[in-house]
Every structure is written in structure tokens, then in C-alpha cells.
Curated annotation (Swiss-Prot):
This is Probable galactarate/D-glucarate transporter GarP. It holds the Pfam family MFS_1. The gene is garP. One of its GO terms (biological process) is galactarate metabolic process. Its main location: membrane. Probably involved in the uptake of galactarate and/or D-glucarate. May also transport D-glycerate. The lineage of its organism: Bacteria, Pseudomonadati, Pseudomonadota, Gammaproteobacteria, Enterobacterales. Belongs to the major facilitator superfamily. Phthalate permease family.
Length: 444
């Protein structure tokens, strides 16, 4: 008994924070791999002789595959568990990132098609990642900590841009665009090995103390999420009537469409923002790598603060509905200020406005906490997949729309209006469509 007590004390009482740190790091690399082409894009387009419209299609290739795999990916997560599916996802997205560094070995006529294919397979492989993050947070964190935890892993996208944009810009400048992809691929392979070793279910984790397990399970964490019973919703497959129930629920539809509009802002920054700075503002690639990190850092700060503020409101006794909606509405109002960049030629002011807009986007990007709060507990992964289908339609639409606008109008002005209006539409979804935020119950 004494030995048992000693062993128990050696275990972590905050193992969930270690899990969150790992998710944060993996998500940062996830977004860096998405953004590799935007940083190297000017040089890639020049060497492979690609037009703005062609680049728009290549940027959107990720989104086509990412969207197509969302519902199958969510079902795979519910059936096989987060650890196993995420392991394969991480390995293969790292592989296809690595291989993008070799597309110049193809004849020029095929190089653009090869890049499109690699980006398509990158999206295919990354598809389960965010639904898996939502499942892991739902399994490991009590309700009152879930907003902060979700905001932290979601803010990894901004931290990623802040950390990797200067690095990838320097690699492009000093070593060539090919090394942007090969270096990121190798980082992903290392993370795959660490993931296998460090990630476990709450009830199986060797560092998990009985005290922490009791605390999280009694306060809303779904600790047995991956302990599936025969005949459960996950075990029996992605039934069409489950998806129909999600799509006929007004609250869920408001959340789904809101995520589409929020993601439009994200995909502008992930694809065209560095090219905007080069073509519209005349910056060098090396300078763009540094400048792009400023809005990203502000987005990171906004992302963390939005989650903390939301959970603070819950702890003060405010309703879950108000605590989630207020940061979203305020954040989207700030994000819409991106339109003001059309009214100044001052580069410093443009960067400041972009930073304010990205801070607002981060502050209001609480879609994943809302999904953790509202998804039917039997199909959290599937619900996250449907949510991500809606959200990542933006990964297809945004690059293409901006590519055509820039090609036809020879300016980014209309593109910034498109992005700013999307922020306002996200606000409308949460104010007038979502209604009360509560967990949806499946009709069996």
C-alpha cells in the first residue's frame, strides 16, 4: 500500500496539460505544412511558370481532399480511436509535404500537375487532425476548461505562422524553395515517433493519477470515448440518419456555416497573404517571412485570450451560450477591419490592420470549443468531421475566388472586401441562427 501511494504520487496530476502541449505542437506543424506553399509560392510559380489562376487551383487542391475526407475521417476516429488514426494521418501528411520538394524533377509540363497532386494528398492525409483534436480535448478536459484547451490547440495555427514564416522565408531565400518542404517533412517524421510514445487514452495513460482521472470524469470529460461497445453509433458506421439529424438541427447548422465564414479569413492568411505583401506592397520574400509573423503572433494572442475569456465568463456564472457567443461576435467585428487596408498605402499601417484583423479572428475562433460543447457524445468525431466539411469549403473557395479576383482586377482590393464580409457573416450566424448552445441528443 505504501509503495502504491508513492507510485501514485509520482504520477502527474496534470497529465492533461502534457496532452494539450503535444496537440499544440503537432497542430503547429500541421498548419506550417499547409502554409509551406504560400511562403515559397512566388518562387514556385516563377520556376514552374504558373499563373495566378493556376496557383489558385493548386492552393485549393488541399481543400478538395481535406473536405472529401472529413466525414470518413470522423467515422474512422469514432471507430478506431484518436491515437491510431492520428498516427497514420501525421505520418502520411509529413510524407507528402516532404515529396513536394521534388516536383521540379518532373518535366515542366507535369510539374504543376504533380504539385497539385501532392497538395491534394496532403489535404487527404491531414483531414482527421482537427476532429481528432476536438475528440482528445473532449476526452481529457472538463467542461469549464474545454474552451481554453480548445482555444490553445486552435491558436497553434497562429503560433505556427509566427514561428515558421521567418524560418521558411529564410530557407526559400538561402537554400531554395525545395528545402521548405523537405525540412518540414523531416520534422513531421520525428513528431510521429513522439506521438506514438506519448499519447494514450485518459484511462490508459501511464502518467494519469486516480485523482486527475476522477476530477476530469466528474466534470464533463468523456474519458471512455474510445472504449466502444458493440452496436454503438461509432461501431455501426456513419449512418446517414445521424448526419441528417446534424443537418436538420438549427443550432448545428449555424455553427457549421459560421465556421465556413471564419475559415475564409484563415485561408486568406494561409494562401494569398504572403503573395499580397510581395505583389501589392513590394516586399521581398525574406521580409515577408518576418512581417507575416506579426499578424500571426497577434492571432495567437487572440486565440488564447478568446478561450480564456470564454471560460472565465462560465466560471463567473454566465450561461454557456453567452460565454461562447460574446468572444465570437467581438472577434469577428475586429476581423472585418481588414477591409480598411484598401484605404492606405502605408505598409506599416497595413501590417497593423492585418494584425488587428487576425487578432480578432483568433479571439472569435471558438468553433471547436462549441463543437465539444454541442456534439452528440456518441459521434463527436463524425460531428467534428461534418463541421470541418463546412469549414473547409473555404479552403477551396477562398484561394480560387481570390485568384480570379486578382487575375481579373489586377488588385487585391476586392479580395479584402470578400474576406472582411465573411467575418461579418460569421457574426450573423452566431447572433441569429445558432440560438442556445447545448449538447445535442441523438434520436436513436
Amino acid at each position: 500500500m505504501i509503495l502504491d501511494t508513492v507510485d501514485e504520487k509520482k504520477k502527474g496530476v496534470h497529465t492533461r496539460y502534457l496532452i494539450l502541449l503535444i496537440i499544440f505542437i503537432v497542430t503547429a506543424v500541421n498548419y506550417a505544412d499547409r502554409a509551406t506553399l504560400s511562403i515559397a509560392g512566388t518562387e514556385v510559380a516563377k520556376e514552374l511558370q504558373l499563373s495566378a489562376v493556376s496557383m489558385g487551383y493548386i492552393f485549393s487542391a488541399f481543400g478538395w481532399a481535406y473536405l472529401l475526407m472529413q466525414i470518413p475521417g470522423g467515422w474512422l476516429l469514432d471507430k478506431f480511436g484518436s491515437k491510431k488514426v492520428y498516427t497514420y494521418s501525421l505520418f502520411f501528411w509529413s510524407l507528402f509535404t516532404f515529396l513536394q520538394g521534388f516536383v521540379d524533377m518532373f518535366p515542366l509540363a507535369w510539374a504543376g500537375i504533380s504539385m497539385f497532386f501532392m497538395r491534394f494528398m496532403l489535404g487527404f492525409s491531414e483531414a482527421p487532425s482537427f476532429p481528432a483534436n476536438a475528440r482528445i480535448v473532449a476526452a481529457w478536459f472538463p467542461t469549464k476548461e474545454r474552451g481554453t484547451a480548445s482555444a490553445i490547440f486552435n491558436s497553434a495555427q497562429y503560433f505556427s505562422l509566427a514561428l515558421f514564416s521567418p524560418l521558411l522565408g529564410w530557407l526559400t531565400f538561402a537554400w531554395g524553395w525545395e528545402h521548405v518542404f523537405t525540412v518540414m517533412g523531416v520534422i513531421g517524421f520525428v513528431l510521429t515517433a513522439l506521438w506514438i510514445k506519448l499519447i494514450h487514452n485518459p484511462t490508459d495513460h501511464p502518467r494519469m493519477s486516480a485523482e486527475e482521472l476522477k476530477f476530469i470524469s466528474e466534470n464533463g470529460a468523456v474519458v471512455d470515448m474510445d472504449h466502444k461497445k458493440p452496436g454503438s453509433a461509432a461501431a455501426s458506421g456513419p449512418k446517414l440518419h445521424y448526419i441528417k439529424q446534424l443537418l436538420s438541427n438549427r443550432m448545428m447548422l449555424g455553427v457549421f456555416f459560421g465556421q465556413y465564414f471564419i475559415n475564409t479569413i484563415t485561408w486568406f492568411f494561409l494562401t494569398w497573404f504572403p503573395i499580397y505583401l510581395v505583389q501589392e506592397k513590394g516586399m521581398s520574400i525574406l521580409k515577408v517571412g518576418l512581417v507575416a509573423s506579426i499578424p500571426a503572433l497577434c492571432g495567437f494572442a487572440g486565440g488564447v485570450l478568446g478561450g480564456v475569456f470564454s471560460d472565465y465568463l462560465i466560471k463567473r456564472g454566465l450561461s454557456l451560450t453567452l460565454a461562447r457567443k460574446l468572444p465570437i461576435v467581438l472577434g469577428m467585428l475586429l476581423a472585418s477591419t481588414i477591409i480598411l487596408c484598401n484605404y492606405t498605402n502605408n505598409t506599416t499601417l497595413v501590417v497593423m490592420l492585418m494584425a488587428l484583423a487576425f487578432f480578432g479572428k483568433g479571439f472569435g475562433a471558438l468553433g471547436w470549443p462549441v463543437i465539444s460543447d454541442t456534439a452528440p457524445k456518441e459521434i463527436v468525431g463524425l460531428c467534428g468531421g461534418v463541421f470541418n466539411v463546412f469549414g473547409n469549403v473555404a479552403s477551396i473557395v477562398t484561394p480560387l475566388v481570390i485568384g480570379y479576383l486578382v487575375s481579373e482586377l489586377h488588385s487585391f482590393n476586392a479580395a479584402l472586401v470578400f474576406v472582411g464580409c465573411s467575418a461579418l457573416m460569421a457574426m450573423v450566424c452566431y447572433l441569429f441562427v445558432v440560438g442556445d448552445i447545448k449538447r445535442m441528443e441523438l434520436q436513436k
